[in-house]
């Protein structure tokens, strides 16, 4: 089956992949992919990237079997761009649209590379326990991280907790026997706050401390999980309210400037009679 994947939780990326089965444990062959390192141009590039991966493979939307979108967590504007593009394409092509948490892409990359077998964390302790509890983090700005905890075994991984947002120094590693090595931490957010996470008991894997979620890794994670097991819920995981809100002080000044109830509007006020104020941006996409 052909799956078009999009993720805009950090950078903007699109990938077209052929998955050999919709059952768990499948593999994905990336046919074409594009990624922008610019974390602020998502709205401008997502649709063109989708068109380009199809053009590169000589296909069109009719050939696509499903659309996959990363659901975050991520900043409001960027994350919304990818999700809305995925929904629009799914609607236009009459194809199912699936959602998968974006941080899954990072743990997929590390797992596929054998990081948990080769790192000192896994070699010394990870596969001797039922699972290695692994932190995956991305940059939430404001000196915070978006993060989730995954349980990693020899056979795969699963979400153990999260996602959540908060300061890195408040993200404490699970308490293991003192003889155990520290639990691993991955992702760009881990690289930004290596010192704070190390002090909190994590072992930041340097080879994976630069990673952002990508559409290519996301679709590989979807194949491993099984497309038939994916959720059709594409609700965005913003985790905190949008910055694009009118300040409370400005709202108060606006309210105090309104004419008393029952007073007749004149001039410019008459032109706007009946218009409703724009609603504030929601904290979560419906």
Residue ranges and their predicted role:
Residues 23-29, 35, 41, 96-212, ...:
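Surface "functional belts" at beta-alpha junctions
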Residues 53-57, 92, 110-113, 215-227:
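Stable alpha-helical structural segments in soluble proteins, enriched in small hydrophobic residues
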Residues 1-73, 284-285:
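N-terminal beta-alpha supersecondary unit
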Residues 37-45, 76, 80, 84, ...:
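Residues at secondary-structure transition points
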Residues 4, 15-17, 146-150, 237:
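Conserved hydrophobic/aromatic positions in well-ordered beta-strands
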Residues 206-263, 268, 274-286:
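Acyltransferase
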Residues 68-97, 102:
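DPxDG-like acidic metal-binding loop motif
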